[in-house]
């Protein structure tokens, strides 16, 4: 008997950055999301989306410290956002992202059950109790269940978290991560 594997195209990883000295916070955030962690001490901190998976090649997130060039840009951008020339438009942009997280640049993680999704949301809502460094750094922007006001679909529950600990891009604007459970 011959077994043939079906080859599919899939998103295999998300590359993220964290601020200098915040590797432990990035790890704590991955743990809140329910990820399995692999940290060899090298430049990359790896998180397996499904903790029991065998490989770090697919279904993974990688995080590394920002480059010095990005950190210099981040600092200049934060200065401009904090009372500088970008304060008003930056504030409006971030407020809109928080009000309508479905419209933000984000990536999603699917959970196998509504209970696992709800447990993850609960961990995030109480993150500061377990990791004080995450206080004010990760929050739930919104939870949209089928039929709820603001829900875009009846096929899944979507929860959006916002963090400035990790980002796939600039940390100054934060990162939204969609957590979802798909209705069977």
Language-model segments: which ranges?
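Core segments of cupin and vicinal oxygen chelate
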Residues: 5-10, 15-75, 122, 141-146
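Short beta-strand/turn micro-motifs at beta-sheet edges
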Residues: 2-3, 93-97
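Short proline/glycine- and acidic-rich turn/helix-capping motifs at secondary-structure junctions
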Residues: 137-154
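Hydrophobic side chains in beta-strands
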Residues: 16, 63, 109, 161-163, ...
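Vicinal oxygen chelate
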Residues: 9-21, 74-82, 95-124
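A common structural junction motif
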Residues: 34-37, 125-137
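Charged, glycine/proline-rich intrinsically disordered loops and linkers
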Residues: 62-94
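Acidic, proline/glycine-rich low-complexity IDRs
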Residues: 149-184
């Amino acid at each position: 008997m011959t077994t043939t594997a079906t080859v599919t195209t899939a998103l295999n990883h998300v590359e993220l950055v964290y601020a200098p000295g915040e590797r432990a916070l990035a790890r704590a955030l991955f743990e809140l999301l329910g990820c399995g962690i692999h940290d060899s001490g090298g430049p990359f901190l790896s998180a397996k989306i499904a903790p029991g998976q065998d490989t770090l090649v697919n279904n993974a997130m990688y995080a590394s410290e920002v480059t010095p060039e990005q950190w210099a840009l981040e600092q200049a951008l934060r200065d401009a956002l904090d009372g500088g020339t970008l304060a008003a438009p930056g504030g409006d942009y971030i407020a809109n992202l928080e009000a309508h997280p479905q419209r933000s640049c984000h990536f999603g993680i699917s959970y196998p059950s509504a209970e696992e999704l709800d447990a993850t949301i609960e961990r995030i809502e109480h993150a500061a109790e377990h990791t004080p460094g995450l206080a004010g750094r990760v929050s739930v922007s919104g939870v949209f269940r089928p039929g709820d006001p603001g829900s875009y679909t009846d096929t899944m529950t979507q929860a959006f978290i916002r963090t400035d600990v990790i980002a796939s891009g600039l940390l100054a604007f934060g990162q939204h991560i969609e957590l979802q459970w798909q209705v069977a």
